[in-house]
Design a protein with these regions (language model features):
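Glycine-rich, acidic and aromatic/proline-enriched surface loops and short helix-turn segments
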Residues: 1, 59-66, 115-130, 160-164, ...
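Second-shell loop/turn segments in exported
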Residues: 1-8, 17-18, 22, 42-51, ...
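Non-catalytic, structured segments within soluble enzyme domains
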Residues: 1-84, 91, 226-230, 235-238, ...
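Extracytoplasmic/secreted proteins, especially bacterial periplasmic and envelope-associated proteins
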Residues: 5, 9-22, 51, 55, ...
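Acidic/histidine-enriched alpha-helical segments
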Residues: 8-12, 23-42, 110-116, 171-176, ...
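Conserved catalytic neighborhood of penicillin-recognizing serine enzymes
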Residues: 48-52, 164-224, 270, 281-312, ...
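A penicillin-recognizing enzyme superfamily signal
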Residues: 83-104, 113-115, 126, 132-138, ...
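Primarily short, surface-exposed interaction patches in extracytoplasmic proteins
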Residues: 133, 219-257, 285-288
Length: 425
């Protein structure tokens, strides 16, 4: 797509290609003399595809194609396409991003948001970028970025499935060194903070790396990956069964993580996300009717304990910004290595949503954006999530989660991390 200020470069490139074609004898001098630089029309900045809605239109078209509707059918017109999008929620997503978009942000800052109805897979809101005409890549469904600590929830589920209780005690000192296939793997907490002996509830609340890595080793990295897959992270997202998998070194799409957390909100029922709910022909006959595709991925007991732990992230941990919602919330912040991405994935019983911040270059940090020394999942992403949910849930009843099942009991069982503590420098 033509970008303002590139006219001279485009003209030079035109002449360069033309001269090369003459040298290759694909054009004669006479033919080339008749060829003039084409007039470049200004880029369209308005119309049906402008703004965030262009990403939704393209996403709907892609889903229709997967459902078997060919381009000719869509171009002829006359079809009535109904989607799962909730008008109030969709506008809330756009408004929330606009309200908390960091001032003086770099041009390549990307924000994706997806909200899903737990238990059905209906996509209620989707924000894929500020302007489709500026950039066609959908930051909610196509862009990828490291998931950070949002993946710790998968290790917690694997632990609960193996009977490891939330009351179990672990060493939260920092840094520690663990074994990774015979090689030393040094793990530090955010800010290199040490926490001493704490239970899994506190480890979740504080997002303690030096506890979740040995937890993942204890339950088996393969099982952590298996939980992620069952929750909704697709096979297309590469996940290596190594100790680092619990720290979210994999790079999913925002919709993938939103769907996984929707599984948690639905008490273990995984659904396939979808946008198109019905297609009517020109005669109003039903050409397609969506049916939610669901399956039981986890037990209610495991989900009850997971949610209980993730509530602590909100009530006294890294996701405290969501307290402003004034409803029961469970969720997890996520900040990847070197602050290359920042996430907030959380849910109420009615809606699960994920918000992610990242840049085009995965090696570039978010630090400094919005005047923050360190942009984390608990900052802008959590604020956007909370603002979105306030409007999306307006008028909806306040609902709570099931009570914890207390898998494995309430005794503070001391677990051996297997890590070797390194002296702080």
């Amino acid at each position: 797509m033509f970008k303002e200020g590139n006219a001279e470069r485009l003209a030079a490139r035109f002449e360069y290609v033309k001269n090369n074609m003459i040298e290759a004898k694909w054009l004669t001098e006479a033919e080339a003399a008749k060829m003039k630089v084409p007039t470049i029309a200004p880029r369209s900045t308005s119309g049906q595809l402008s703004g965030p809605k262009g990403h939704i239109i393209e996403a709907v078209q892609k889903e229709l194609a997967k459902l078997g509707f060919v381009q000719d059918q869509l171009l002829v017109g006359g079809l009535v396409i109904k989607t799962t999008l909730d008008q109030k929620a969709q506008q809330a997503a756009v408004d929330a991003v606009n309200k908390f978009y960091p001032s003086k942000a770099p041009d390549d800052l990307r924000i994706g948001l997806v909200a899903i109805r737990p238990g059905t897979g209906e996509i209620l809101a989707l924000y894929g970028g500020r302007d489709y005409l500026e950039r066609q890549l959908n930051d909610a469904t196509q862009s990828i970025t490291q998931a950070g600590s949002t993946f710790k929830s998968f290790a917690l589920v694997a632990a609960l499935e193996q009977g490891i209780p939330l009351s179990s005690m672990w060493n939260g000192d920092s840094p520690q060194t663990f074994d990774d296939a015979g090689k030393p793997y040094v793990v530090s907490n955010y800010g290199n903070n040490g926490f001493g002996q704490v239970n899994l509830l506190e480890a979740t609340k504080r997002s303690i790396n030096t506890i979740f890595v040995p937890l993942g080793i204890k339950v088996g990295p393969t099982n952590v990956v298996d939980v992620a897959r069952r929750a909704g992270i697709p096979e297309s997202v590469a996940m290596m069964p190594t100790p680092s998998v619990v720290l979210g070194t994999s790079s999913p799409h925002v919709i993938d993580v939103a769907n996984a957390y929707a599984t948690f909100a639905a008490q273990g029922i995984k659904s396939k996300p979808f946008l198109v709910t019905q297609v009517l022909g020109s005669n109003k006959g039903v050409l397609y009717e969506a049916t939610p595709q669901t399956e039981e991925a986890f037990s209610r007991e495991v989900m009850a304990d997971l949610t209980y732990a993730l509530k602590g992230t909100i009530t006294g941990g890294t996701g405290a910004a969501a307290l402003a919602l004034g409803r029961p919330v469970a969720g997890k912040t996520g900040t990847s290595q070197s602050n290359a991405s920042a996430w907030f994935s959380a849910y109420t019983p009615q809606i699960a949503a994920s918000v992610a911040f990242f840049r085009d270059n995965a090696t570039q940090s978010l630090n400094g954006i919005g005047g923050m020394t360190s942009l984390t999942g608990g900052s802008f992403p959590a604020r956007i999530w909370t603002e979105f949910m306030k409007k999306a849930l307006k008028g909806e009843p306040i609902m709570d989660f099931p009570a914890p099942a207390n898998i494995g009991g309430l005794e503070p069982i001391v677990m051996t991390s297997g890590g070797v503590q390194k002296p702080k420098e």
